[in-house]
Swiss-Prot record:
Plays a role in the transport of magnesium and cobalt ions. This is Magnesium and cobalt efflux protein CorC. The keyword Repeat applies. InterPro entries: CBS_dom, CBS_dom_sf, CorC_N, FAD-bd_PCMH-like_sf, FAD-bd_PCMH_sub2, Ion_transp-like_CBS, Transptr-assoc_dom. Belongs to the UPF0053 family. It comes from the Bacteria. Residues 72-131, 137-194 form the CBS domain. PROSITE patterns: CBS (PS51371). One of its GO terms (molecular function) is flavin adenine dinucleotide binding. One of its GO terms (cellular component) is plasma membrane. It holds the Pfam family CBS.
Amino acid sequence: MSDDNAQHSDKENKKGFFSILLSQIFHDEPKNKEELLTLIKYSEENELIDRETGHMLEGVIHITKQKIRDIMIPRPQMITLKLTYSLEQCLDVITKSLHSRFPVMSENENYVEGFLITKDLLPFIKNNTEMFCIKKILRPAIVVPESKHVNHMLKEFRLTKNHMAIVIDEFGVVSGLVTIEDILELIVGNIEDEYDETKKNICQLNQSTFIIKSLTSIKEFNETFNTNFNDEEVDTIGGLVMKKIGHLPIRGEYININQYKFKIHIANNRRIILLQVTIPKK
């Protein structure tokens, strides 16, 4: 009997809290984002929403603070096509990267002429190879400033039905690109497609600099660079870097670990995404 009373009491408490929650939302709205985040946390703790839902709600709130420069893919990491490319050259890049959309650069690579969507190549693959002209099948490129807020970019993507935009700096120079997937990942977490497992965790930029996915295991890092990094509490190189820094770092922040320089290349409000690593000279 006492167990039944306890369960009834728990339900009443949750019902009471839910009433307060509804009152907060529809009558006495939270005064600021901090109060709203606190309300979400309380909702999780009282099992009114699950943790995953809480994460998504927090993500929606946090994107209002972020700008495109915080989440964009930097220009050195952009995979592009050139206006002068033949069909064969385009297909070579496409099959290696497995992306579905590509910025097409001008001959001097200073400007983006437009976007190529891979499905637009299908009519040329079988019978019309000689008729192929990349310029004739380009889609217009959306260009946005680095300072644009992420939530405004998401709204623009939704209204224009576009999935990718070119990012320019204050001087009008291409500095990167942003996709709708980059923004959605801020809300729902990492989105992996069927090809993600084939993409390399470690990519070499030059003799001493590498771009590394933060989810790369410490074991793989050690095997690649012949290092002996080890930590019982974390398994990934991103986790190791964040532990050493002591907080969730922002883009551009760096730390030296055993003569290896780790620079935060891309990060969002929850995690490190990419690291730029400079290895010591031998």
